[in-house]
């Protein structure tokens, strides 16, 4: 791609041959923009520069003659000045603000829309006074022919000199103009010159405004200069010079001749060709009058003030001026458009049109239908061609437009050949001195240059003007040789030069070959000069914008069809295609569009070719295939992030521009020319849309967006200023008023002091004493009066309040008495109504007979005369029901009628459901054995007609007797349309009974569904397996999984109007509670025959969304399966009863008032007042709807269940932590918190209480739940090198010691190389041997010295002879390391022992023992078989605490590697490494590597190196007491067992069970405790499984299957809630509760996983309980909760039931309780009332002193709602596959919740006796201590917040 400077250099040669053209002649060519000017560096760019593009020179400009330039020596307004111009050179040097000028004088390419007049830095051109008059072409040529001929070389030199003179004159004029402007600037800055014009010039200007304006005095409209000025003038609008449509006054231009200074044209040169063309057109049409152009001049000069350019950030003051400026610009655009449309431009004879390339000529002719479209053939011609060949290849068509070519063809018959100035007669050729345009040379000069091959300065039109004459000369010469005959055609006409102007294309290639490539010339737009210039500029812009190198040329275009046929749009196009599609150059030539239809429209308008018929120009696709950038061969480069953002932004802007263009031309762009507005036919979408038309890097749309952003910021800033103006004004106004008031007060004070000071002092002296006494008396009197009346009013208020209070208490007591009687009658009525309903329903469905089994006691029903109740006839009017009356008979009659209505409603509901099923086409059910109509309330004796059900035949199992009775009871429920609760104890087969009921309905009643089974997530697979096992004819559809899977399943069962038979796709739908709530809207669309809820305690909370969602499902009957209908309170029972019978049990308050209060309070055994009559009535109400059997009554073959409590004492560490927690708990705070634990209390109190309980339970489980004993290591003062990838090392990894001390010691290298370094003795030691003297004289370990000294008497080496060693061995031994010496000594002893003689056996005959030695006579103290004393001492030492590593040696706080000296010598470093890492020592100490232990070759080699050393090394083979202590202390695993008393007891218990062959279920409450148990089981190597709330459903099923089938698994760890519901684990015979649940039902369900139907062994249940801790008391409270259901559904009536207020007793010992009771009695004797806590007040909480994180949360210990939510989370298994695929982990303990609304407890009734005693005693202690007054509720002293600091052993410090 050619750069900008190259384009300037190419343009330079044309500037020597052309001058600036007159503005008058160029007025009709101001059609489009060029790249904008560079901004001034000294000032900020104004907003208009962002919104509007800068001016551009117009296209197709013909320079004026040189003489004109001499008269007007100003540079052209449309072209930059010459290369010697300082402004031009500056623009070239600064690439940021430069752009390439046009390379030729004909066309200036651009891809901009049409400009506005304000874009130019000069005033709009004006028209001359009269249209210029010129000679006709023929007369003009004749005048030229008459002149004498001039030599071509002389004429050429003369023109050169004229042009040089014109250039110098122009420069002088510019210098004068610059000085004049500068003087005006200085004059304008002087005072009084505000109204003067500002003729400042823009620096680096390539377009001096003097060319356009000429020497005019009015130079006010200029741009701001670098220096800046206070005022700037607004630019003129075109409306001042040109007419608009709104103009009412049109004046000819002659009236304004004096106001317009237009220089006359030169006389010695011909007029420009454009004017010749206009004159010729006017001459052809004499009828058309020549109307002078009209102008409307508005002389208005306004100035706007602007700030100094140095005020950065104050451009907001330009806003109004810019808005007005922009509006003027829009008006100017419209004015220019209208003016251009009014100009009729015609090309005359001989006038050159825009140059066309071969491709464009072919396109035009194709439209006109003259020639066909030729195929593109790429043929390379030789670069060396003769000029004759090129001239012979020139086009025969004349230059100009297709119309001109057509006229030339018409004139062929007249033997005319079109030249530059009109038709030329071959017989009379033009004069050689005729001027050829646009070059300005004579014909002789042009012919001479063409013949010489020098085409510099010539254009295609110049060559075409003379090519015919040159061809005729050549043919004439040939004809002279051939006989003087010119070549003629068949019709006799002279043959013209054949073919298009190919020769000129080749000639032009001489100066083009450096600019373009062959591939570029073949593109669609490379045929014209404009296209080539635009392409190169676009490519330069793209390269600059994308920061890329030269853009790829010749990129192909991939076109796609648009909506309209024949329309094509490039998918990926480069700058050439973009220019071709959006080229606006020719669209503005109105005359050529109107007459010739030759080129495309401008931006925003449709192509002129689109207006022609499709038949004349059929669309043709391009043959080239375009690939996306980076696709295909070559390397693909991913665009960077800025490029991606730029592409997205460009695409958005392109779409925005296309939409705007479809709507019509905007204010910035306009279409010039008459005719209708054209619409855009193609929407171009580029892969890359960089800025290709603006060197500044800002496109028009981007500039608009920036302008909008700047406007938004300015508006925001101004809005803030406007918003703050009133406030600041108020502040200023207030300040002003305050200052005025202060000044006024000061003035008044001054006046008083000035005029009245003397008089005031005199009066004060006279009456000072009197006034003082009177004031004191007055004050005393007023005070006494106020005290008297205040006391009087207080006494009156007290008396009045006392009387009102007494009256209120009396009225309240009377109202309470009346309300009590009323509620009693109301409850009696409701109970009577419910009893009547239950009595007859119970007789009907035989609940009594179903419960009556062998060994089970059943009460005899007392006849209360219900059969004899006389209700009267139906419809008998009864008195209104009034609970205030004492008419019991009326209440009984209303109750009987209500019961009858309830029975009738249930019967009608069941019948309506059956009718709806029949109406949908379902088969009729079989005949019922008993009709519902027979249930007549008047005759209750209907038991003999009840249904007796046998086992269904399709059931593939044998039901037991009690199960068959349960099936009969369920069948009778269905017959009556009644819902029920099957509450058999866990393990009695509730599932098989419900399955048999479905089989009974399908077999006997032909009801095949749909049935809905909702169960916990852990039991879904169990339901599916049992249905497929027992009733294979019933098709079960499992409905769970991901949302997509469920959507697929819904297509099966949610179809409307489907009938159910045996062949239906499904009969039973199985899903979970969670999915039933989520897909409630889909389940409500079905009408279910039966809905079965397994583990129905999941809906025991009536306030939960689950309870409400399931209650809204449409079903005929509901069946609840639960083993624990009552878990905590009567509220749960009411929730289940309301779910099955909402008509009867509709009020929970009434039910709780009658039953809950008395039963729950009486279970405490202290204040119980439950009457037997109430209990019997409750049983009578529940029995018809609930069937419950227990195992001991109905299951004889089931093994026994034994429960054993294992009480353990806390370990030392646990006791210390428990004691520390206990000391930081204030009993007083606990009591106050328990009293305040009401619905309106502070919820933080409850949370703190729950948190405290969790901390104590953690201590009881394991102290590591607080803080694990971490690995302890000292601080290492050193560095380590980073290891590589260990996966690549394989089995044998090389891990050298890389520890390096941070301290480095540098030693001189001379110490190592030249001696002087100390070293340890050794074979290779250099100590003392660096020199000859040290080696021989001073070294005593040499063999020579040792041998010499052995010969001397009393020598130091005399021992050598005694030991039998040679001097050489002694020297080598001395120099060897100690380890080598030991190994050699051991080897000698081994050989001596194995190979030596027996010298130590005194009884051996051949003994060589010395005779003088005496054998040992020490007696042996141990008998054979006894343990030696040495072994005993070793065992005791090993078992002692002191033998542990952490006890033997205190760990260092910091360690550091040795400091290694460093010298710059490689041999020194190697020697150091050999000393530190000796292979022999390393192998001896650590032995072989683990991978080499079993390698015989390695073992043999090791034995040779280190004989008598085991293969594992000396350190592993040595005792622990002999090995060094490791600095890394790892807690032993045994400590995990010893620190917890429960875990230590569990360890011993598991050993016993493992030895006995038992299998264990281990239940936990905390998941963190399960993690610790997993470590223990791994340590003991027990096989185990783990199931908690995070286990997915599929894994749960697999784990249960593995447990049941694999006897090798010893332990199954489960959480109580996740593993205690609905799964069968009968393979286990032992259940261990590590920590028990607060809810006894949860533990009961968990243990029944093993003790259930199918268990043949005896089940043993162990409970690990910490003695004397909170766990022991919690277990007592939990067992007391179990007695509630025994009271309700059993026979037990009295038990200890815990209250939330009795939580305090969990933290108190028996002695503390007894002491509290004694103190409470003393307090009651003194009339003390226990204080309460203000709910909203912030008090110090008892838990504040315990800054501990529970980590587990509450398990619902004190809250039923929390327990319900916890159960819901566990039973759903939050790791289920349906949604999260294992995401989320449900802990065994649920989150902390707060009391359920509705459970109101008063202080007196809510607190137990022990808690009340403790509260009174604590309060009395404070009274006696004097801290508070009696009868006052004061808060206890705040407790200090203390953190428990744990030591390294885990104990509190």
From Swiss-Prot:
ATP binds at residues 984-991. One of its GO terms (cellular component) is Ino80 complex. A motif (DEAQ box) lies at residues 1094-1097. Residues 971-1143 form the Helicase ATP-binding domain. Residues 790-833 form a coiled coil. GO terms for molecular function: ATP binding; ATP hydrolysis activity; ATP-dependent chromatin remodeler activity; DNA binding; histone binding. Residues 55-66 have a biased composition (Pro residues). Keywords: Activator, ATP-binding, Coiled coil, DNA damage, DNA repair, DNA-binding, Hydrolase, Nucleotide-binding, Nucleus, Transcription, Transcription regulation. Residues 717-847 form the DBINO domain. The keyword rRNA processing does not apply. Pfam families: DBINO, Helicase_C, SNF2-rel_dom. Residues 1545-1695 form the Helicase C-terminal domain. The keyword Mitochondrion does not apply. Residues 7-19, 495-507 have a biased composition (Basic residues). Residues 1-148, 189-250, 391-430, 478-534, 546-676, 1768-1788, 1828-1853 are annotated as: Disordered. It is found in: Nucleus. Residues 392-406 have a biased composition (Low complexity). GO terms for biological process: chromatin remodeling; DNA repair; DNA-templated transcription; regulation of macromolecule metabolic process. It catalyses: ATP + H2O = ADP + phosphate + H(+). It is an enzyme of class 3 (hydrolase). Belongs to the SNF2/RAD54 helicase family. PANTHER family: CHROMATIN-REMODELING ATPASE INO80, HELICASE SRCAP-RELATED. The DBINO region is involved in binding to DNA. ATPase component of the INO80 complex which remodels chromatin by shifting nucleosomes and is involved in DNA repair. This is Chromatin-remodeling ATPase INO80. It comes from Cryptococcus neoformans var. neoformans serotype D (strain JEC21 / ATCC MYA-565). The gene is INO80.
């Amino acid at each position: 791609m050619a750069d900008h400077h190259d384009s300037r250099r190419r343009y330079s040669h044309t500037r020597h041959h052309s001058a600036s053209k007159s503005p008058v002649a160029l007025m009709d060519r101001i059609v489009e923009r060029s790249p904008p000017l560079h901004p001034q560096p000294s000032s900020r760019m104004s907003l208009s520069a962002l919104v509007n593009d800068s001016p551009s020179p117009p296209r197709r400009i013909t320079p004026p003659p040189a003489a004109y330039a001499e008269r007007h020596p100003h540079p052209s307004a449309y072209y930059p000045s010459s290369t010697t111009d300082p402004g031009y050179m500056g623009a070239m040097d600064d690439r940021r603000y430069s752009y390439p000028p046009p390379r030729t004088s004909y066309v200036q390419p651009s891809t901009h829309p049409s400009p506005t007049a304000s874009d130019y830095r000069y005033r709009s051109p004006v028209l001359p006074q009269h249209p210029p008059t010129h000679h006709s072409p023929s007369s003009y040529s004749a005048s030229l022919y008459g002149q004498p001929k001039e030599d071509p070389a002389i004429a050429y030199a003369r023109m050169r000199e004229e042009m040089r003179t014109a250039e110098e004159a122009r420069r002088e004029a510019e210098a004068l103009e610059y000085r004049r402007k500068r003087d005006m600037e200085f004059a304008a800055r002087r005072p009084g010159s505000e109204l003067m014009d500002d003729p400042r010039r823009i620096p680096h200007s390539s377009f001096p405004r003097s060319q356009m304006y000429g020497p005019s005095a009015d130079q006010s409209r200029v741009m701001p200069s670098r220096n800046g000025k206070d005022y700037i003038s607004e630019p003129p609008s075109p409306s001042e010079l040109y007419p608009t449509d709104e103009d009412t006054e049109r004046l000819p231009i002659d009236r304004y001749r004096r106001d317009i200074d237009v220089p006359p044209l030169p006389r010695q040169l011909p007029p420009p060709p454009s004017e010749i063309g206009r004159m010729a057109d006017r001459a052809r049409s004499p009828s058309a009058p020549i109307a002078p152009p009209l102008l409307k001049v508005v002389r208005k000069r306004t100035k706007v003030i602007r700030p100094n350019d140095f005020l950065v950030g104050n451009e907001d003051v330009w806003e109004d001026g810019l808005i007005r400026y922009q509006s003027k610009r829009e008006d100017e655009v419209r004015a220019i458009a209208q003016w251009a449309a009014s100009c009729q431009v015609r090309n005359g004879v001989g006038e050159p049109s825009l140059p066309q390339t071969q491709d464009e000529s072919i396109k035009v002719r194709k439209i006109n239908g003259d020639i066909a479209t030729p195929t593109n053939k790429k043929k390379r011609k030789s670069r060396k061609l003769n000029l004759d060949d090129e001239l012979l290849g020139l086009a025969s068509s004349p230059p100009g437009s297709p119309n001109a070519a057509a006229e030339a063809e018409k004139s062929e018959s007249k033997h005319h050949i079109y030249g530059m100035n009109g038709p030329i007669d071959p017989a009379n050729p033009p004069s050689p001195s005729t001027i050829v345009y646009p070059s300005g040379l004579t014909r002789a000069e042009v012919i001479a240059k063409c013949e010489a091959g020098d085409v510099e300065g010539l254009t295609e039109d110049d060559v075409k003007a003379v090519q015919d004459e040159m061809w005729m000369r050549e043919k004439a010469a040939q004809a002279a040789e051939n006989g003087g005959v010119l070549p003629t055609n068949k019709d006799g006409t002279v043959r013209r030069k054949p073919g298009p102007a190919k020769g000129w294309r080749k000639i032009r290639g001489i100066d083009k070959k450096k600019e373009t490539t062959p591939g570029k010339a073949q593109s669609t737009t490379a045929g014209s000069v404009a296209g080539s210039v635009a392409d190169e500029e676009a490519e330069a812009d793209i390269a600059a914008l994308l920061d890329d190198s030269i853009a790829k040329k010749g990129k192909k275009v991939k076109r796609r069809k648009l909506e309209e046929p024949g329309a094509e749009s490039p998918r990926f196009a480069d700058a050439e295609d973009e220019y071709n599609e959006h080229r606006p150059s020719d669209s503005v030539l109105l005359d050529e569009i109107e007459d010739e239809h030759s080129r495309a429209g401008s931006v925003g308008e449709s192509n002129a070719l689109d207006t022609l018929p499709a038949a004349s120009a059929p669309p043709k696709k391009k043959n080239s295939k375009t690939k996306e950038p980076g696709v295909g061969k070559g390397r693909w480069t991913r665009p960077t992030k800025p490029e991606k953002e730029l592409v997205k932004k460009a695409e958005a802007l392109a779409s925005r521009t296309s939409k705007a263009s479809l709507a019509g031309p905007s204010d910035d762009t306009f279409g010039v020319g008459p005719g209708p507005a054209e619409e855009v036919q193609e929407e171009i979408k580029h892969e890359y849309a960089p800025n290709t038309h603006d060197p500044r890097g800002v496109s028009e749309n981007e500039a608009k967006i920036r302008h909008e952003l700047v406007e938004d910021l300015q508006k925001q800033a101004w809005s803030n200023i406007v918003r703050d103006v009133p406030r600041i004004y108020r502040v200023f106004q207030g300040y002003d008023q305050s200052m005025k008031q202060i000044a006024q007060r000061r003035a008044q004070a001054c006046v008083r002091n000035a005029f009245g000071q003397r008089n005031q002092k005199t009066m004060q002296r006279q009456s000072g004493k009197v006034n003082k006494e009177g004031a004191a008396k007055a004050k005393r009197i007023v005070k006494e009066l106020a005290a008297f009346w205040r006391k009087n009013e207080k006494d009156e208020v007290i008396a009045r309040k006392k009387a009102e209070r007494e009256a209120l208490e009396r009225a309240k007591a009377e109202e309470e008495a009346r309300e009590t009687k009323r509620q009693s009658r109301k409850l009696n009525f409701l109970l009577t109504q419910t009893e009547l309903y239950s009595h007859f329903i119970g007789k009907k469905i035989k609940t009594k007979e179903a419960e009556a089994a062998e060994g089970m006691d059943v009460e005899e029903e007392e006849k209360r005369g219900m059969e004899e109740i006389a209700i009267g006839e139906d419809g008998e009017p009864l008195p209104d029901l009034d609970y205030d009356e004492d008419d019991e008979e009326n209440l009984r009659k209303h109750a009987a009628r209500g019961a009858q209505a309830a029975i009738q409603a249930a019967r009608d509901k069941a019948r309506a459901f059956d009718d709806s099923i029949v109406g949908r086409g379902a088969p009729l059910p079989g005949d019922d054995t008993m009709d519902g109509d027979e249930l007549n309330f008047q005759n209750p004796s209907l038991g003999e007609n009840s249904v007796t059900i046998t086992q269904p035949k399709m059931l593939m199992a044998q039901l037991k007797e009690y199960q068959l009775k349960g099936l009969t009871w369920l069948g009778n429920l269905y017959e009556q349309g009644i819902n029920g609760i099957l509450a058999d104890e866990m393990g009695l087969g509730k599932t098989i009974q419900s399955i048999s009921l479905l089989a009974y309905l399908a077999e006997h009643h032909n009801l095949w569904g749909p049935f809905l089974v909702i169960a916990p997530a852990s039991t879904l697979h169990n339901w599916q397996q049992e249905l497929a096992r027992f009733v294979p004819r019933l098709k079960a559809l499992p409905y769970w999984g991901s949302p997509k899977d469920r959507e697929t399943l819904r297509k099966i069962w949610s179809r409307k109007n489907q009938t159910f038979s045996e062949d239906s796709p499904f009969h039973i739908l199985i899903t979970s509670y969670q999915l039933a709530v989520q897909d409630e809207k889909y389940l409500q669309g079905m009408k279910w025959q039966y809905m079965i809820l397994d583990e129905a305690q999941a809906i025991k909370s009536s306030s939960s969304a689950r309870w409400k969602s399931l209650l809204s499902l449409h079903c005929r009957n509901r069946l609840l399966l639960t083993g624990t209908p009552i878990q905590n309170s009567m509220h749960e029972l009411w929730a289940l009863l309301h779910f099955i019978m909402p008509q009867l049990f509709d009020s929970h308050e009434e039910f709780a008032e009658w039953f809950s209060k008395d039963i729950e309070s009486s279970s405490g055994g202290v204040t119980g007042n439950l009457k037997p009559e109430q209990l019997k009535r409750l049983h009578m109400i529940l029995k018809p709807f609930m069937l419950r059997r227990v195992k001991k009554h109905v299951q004889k073959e089931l093994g026994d269940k034994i429960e054993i409590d294992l009480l353990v004492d806390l370990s030392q560490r646990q006791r210390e932590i428990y004691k520390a927690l206990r000391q930081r708990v204030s009993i007083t705070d606990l009591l106050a918190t328990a009293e305040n634990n009401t619905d309106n209390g502070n919820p933080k109190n409850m949370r703190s209480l729950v948190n405290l309980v969790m901390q104590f339970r953690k201590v009881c489980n394991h102290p590591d739940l607080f803080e694990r004993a971490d690995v302890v290591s000292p601080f290492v003062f050193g560095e380590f090198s980073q290891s590589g990838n260990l996966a690549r090392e394989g089995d044998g990894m090389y891990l050298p010691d890389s520890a390096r001390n941070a301290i480095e010691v540098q030693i001189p290298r001379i110490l190592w190389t030249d001696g002087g370094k100390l070293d340890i003795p050794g074979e290779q030691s250099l100590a003392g041997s660096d020199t000859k003297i040290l080696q021989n004289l001073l070294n005593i370990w040499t063999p020579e010295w040792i041998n010499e000294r052995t010969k001397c008497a009393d020598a130091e080496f005399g021992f050598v002879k005694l030991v039998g060693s040679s001097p050489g061995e002694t020297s080598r031994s001395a120099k060897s390391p100690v380890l080598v010496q030991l190994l050699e000594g051991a080897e000698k002893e081994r050989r001596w022992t194995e190979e030596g003689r027996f010298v130590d056996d005194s009884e051996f005959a051949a003994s060589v023992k010395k005779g003088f030695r005496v054998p040992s006579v020490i007696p042996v103290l141990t008998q054979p078989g006894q343990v030696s004393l040495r072994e005993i001492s070793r065992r005791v030492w090993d078992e002692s605490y002191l033998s542990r590593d952490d006890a033997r040696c205190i760990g260092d706080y910091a360690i550091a590697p040795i400091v290694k000296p460093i010298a710059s010598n490689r041999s020194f470093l190697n020697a150091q490494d050999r000393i530190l890492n000796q292979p022999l020592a390393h192998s001896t100490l650590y032995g072989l590597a683990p991978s080499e232990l079993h390698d015989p070759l390695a073992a043999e080699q090791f034995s040779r190196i280190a004989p008598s050393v085991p293969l594992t090394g000396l350190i592993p083979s040595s005792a622990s007491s002999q090995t060094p202590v490791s600095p890394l202390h790892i807690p032993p695993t045994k400590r995990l067992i010893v620190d917890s008393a429960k875990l230590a007891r569990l360890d011993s218990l598991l050993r016993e069970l493992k030895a006995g062959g038992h299998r264990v279920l281990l239940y936990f409450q905390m998941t963190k405790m399960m993690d610790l148990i997993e470590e223990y089981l791994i340590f003991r190597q027990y096989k185990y499984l783990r199931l908690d709330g995070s286990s997915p459903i599929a894994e749960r099923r697999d784990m249960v299957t593995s447990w049941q089938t694999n006897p090798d698994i010893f332990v199954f760890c489960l959480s109580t809630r996740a593993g205690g519901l609905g799964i069968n684990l009968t393979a286990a015979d032992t259940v261990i509760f590590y920590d028990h649940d607060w809810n006894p039902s949860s533990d009961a369900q968990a243990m029944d996983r093993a003790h259930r139907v199918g268990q043949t062994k005896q089940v043993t249940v162990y409970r690990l309980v910490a003695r004397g801790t909170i766990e022991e008391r919690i277990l007592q409270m939990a067992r007391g909760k179990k007695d509630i259901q025994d009271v309700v559904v059993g026979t037990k009536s009295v038990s200890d039931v815990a209250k939330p207020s009795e939580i305090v007793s969990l933290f108190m010992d028996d002695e503390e309780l007894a002491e509290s009771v004694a103190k409470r009695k003393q307090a009651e004797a003194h009339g003390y009332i226990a204080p309460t806590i203000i709910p909203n007040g912030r008090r110090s909480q008892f838990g504040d002193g315990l800054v501990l994180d529970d980590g587990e949360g509450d398990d619902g210990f004190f809250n039923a709602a929390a327990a319900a939510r916890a159960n819901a989370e566990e039973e759903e298994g939050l790791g289920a596959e349906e949604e999260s695929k294992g995401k989320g982990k449900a802990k065994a303990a649920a989150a902390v919740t707060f009391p359920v609304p509705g459970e109101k407890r008063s202080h007196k009734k809510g607190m137990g006796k022990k808690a009340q005693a403790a509260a009174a005693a604590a309060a009395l202690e404070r009274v006696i201590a004097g801290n508070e007054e009696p009868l006052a509720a004061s808060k206890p002293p705040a407790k200090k917040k203390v953190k428990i600091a744990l030591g390294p052993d885990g104990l509190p410090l």
